[in-house]
């Protein structure tokens, strides 16, 4: 039976989830989702993290009780299935209740002021409002919402039996009738106004609700009679809609926009403003002092900002990929930094502190593969426009570009041991060798045998041989002196990844047939075939520098650590909520890094498998 792989730290933030960033009242912790995992992070130290794991799919919403004792989280699931709501005890970090009523998705959650009730809102396929008893985890009562879609739910701050919901052209104030065990709605009177509401905040005295709309205005609703009172900002609407709202202790309203703008409103005129990268999806008030207040802002670009004081001067606290990560790479014999690539960005990270060291932006293009030159002088990358771009690892400035390196996208790249040549693989099936001079990049050879995209290229330490893995069901070993095929490996699969054993006598491949196959590197015969996954394809492989352990990851979202010689899975890491696209073992054998389609970077403690010598 495989043991769990210990998750050391995570780089990532589910920025697209509305109100997904929460500041805990203890003054030390911020809470946010990443895929199916909930991260509890120390504000000052990004490496000080704890994880709540219990969801089977992506977390869709979070809510924290007023005292900070309880955390509720909802998830999204497959069509036709019920989505779980989990209540966590944050003191013990334990799961208290798991509740399921809503179909497909839990849209929003909120605790009552006395922490007795939890309100949950179903997604588009469910659209029901349910009231839960926090102590027992049982549903108390429920009601279908408006015929149109409802986006958000918020309890009053002083009345535990009153709450407000708002959505597409609808707004209701609900009162819980305990005697009859019913939720009774009151429609808001908005006159001729028609709005799609994205966020709701109730003021401290329960007098007014402030509702952000896709039109870009904020409506002030008098809650006693549920009547439209005022609108703002006074000097024009927020571009791309109001996506997040929050009341600060002074009674002013913080408004975040889809264009990344942040404004502080007092009686609807704007007092101050700033702009951040990405649509603002959550605003979390942290603390208040004599000079002003502190809060955190989460954006759809997966950035977390901390604008300090009432003048809104922002500081970037944390950043992450906002889309799938296609590849990752370590420099040769150096474990402190690693690079990742995805749509529009290459990022360089510091492993120990989990901080971004460098961000290279190439807008509107996707980077499919990344590698360091062996001497560490350049970051090599292959792009969707068929170009190979090399960047300086410290400056981020472009060193050279090979235009039209491939007819289609560049899907695989590698550097020889002397850094004098680059090998690249293309979506059209070509493997090309490039001579890199001081001022020139010359095509040495173009090897055409593959009929499908080249997904991975590895070069032998001596530099006289390489192997390319392709979606056409073949891996080809090439002689880099004659540029001819030495031998081929065939299987009924799309090969996704290939690695050499450190002694280079064997190759290991993985692909869509869910098998991990060992091959003799000289004659191309299969030596051993093991089941890499029970459910889905295996996308990524890595071997440690001594050849003791093999690490795999794929569509089953599991990181598996195998004993290389025995072919036995000793450790399994569970944290990803999307397919794993790349894995790597640090050269010092202390950590394993995995990246996936959810945009998260997961750092695991390396565990040495039991070898034949230990038995």
Swiss-Prot record:
The organism's place on the tree of life at top rank: Eukaryota
GO terms under cellular component: axoneme; ciliary basal body; motile cilium
InterPro entries (alphabetical): WD40/YVTN_repeat-like_dom_sf, WD40_repeat_CS, WD40_repeat_dom_sf, WD40_rpt, WD_repeat_EMAP, WDR90_beta-prop_4th
Tagged with keyword Repeat: yes
Locations listed in the record: Cytoplasm; Cell projection, Cilium, Flagellum
Alphabetical list of Pfam families matching this protein: WD40, WDR90_beta-prop_4th
WD repeat spans: 54-98, 101-142, 145-184, 232-275, 320-359, 362-401, 405-444, 449-488, 490-529, 533-572, 575-614
Keywords: Cell projection, Cilium, Cytoplasm, Flagellum, Repeat, WD repeat
Keyword Cytoplasm: yes
CDD domains (alphabetical): WD40
Family in the record: Belongs to the CFAP52 family.
Function: May play a role in cell growth and/or survival.
Listed name of the protein: Cilia- and flagella-associated protein 52
Gene for this chain: CFAP52
